[in-house]
Amino acid sequence: MWKWLHPYAKPESAYQLSGKLLPWFSILALLCLSVGTVWGLAFAPSDYQQGDSFRIIYIHVPSAIWSMGVYMSMAIAAFIGLVWQIRLSDLAASAMAPIGAVYTFIALLTGAVWGKPMWGAWWVWDARLTAELILLFLYLGVIALYHAFDDQKTASKAAGILAIVGVANLPIIHFSVEWWNTLHQGATITKFEKPSISSDMLWPLLLNIFGFAFFFGAVTMVRFRNEIINNESHRPWVMKLAAAKSQRGN
């Protein structure tokens, strides 16, 4: 597998590969999110306890899941960049950070909207909510460090170390409802047990979970490609690419 991946450690090859994958990820994201959101908001049955207010689950759960998934992906990329000194991994981690921050903010916002009618408050210092808020601060810290130094290697090293250390927060988010007595409900979907919601509610939720994943992949590739161009602007292949685009524009 490494022999297959190794050629794509070169900026030009990575740029070309991401360009080929980007349309597919974009189409899949659009299809999954469109069908899943319309199905969940308009056609899924109401919850017998929460009524229609439960429908925010179709945004809240995918964003919460991928707020952690994006962070883990970012930390892995940062680890590869630190250990094997692969510059593209640092660029990938930098590209992921703002997307993860947005997902985390959406999870917190939708959680507050959902929590108001359920708990009677927009915010409570619940273990999972607090850990999710810390996750947002970690994302913002990583983003700040990437822009805090003029030297990109120093910036990537500092941001990468914070990203890796912050992984310790992910188990706290995931297992908080099991470790402590919290207001937050348990997992809707588990690996080894039957889901706690009906299939009519589950399928649109799964579509949106996949949709958020494909959207993350698509936006990451757009940002990653821009990072490559900015860092390789002096390379002949980038100049050739810019000249070709200029000719097509004329």
Model regions and ranges:
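Polytopic transmembrane helical bundles with strong interfacial aromatic enrichment
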Residues: 1-250
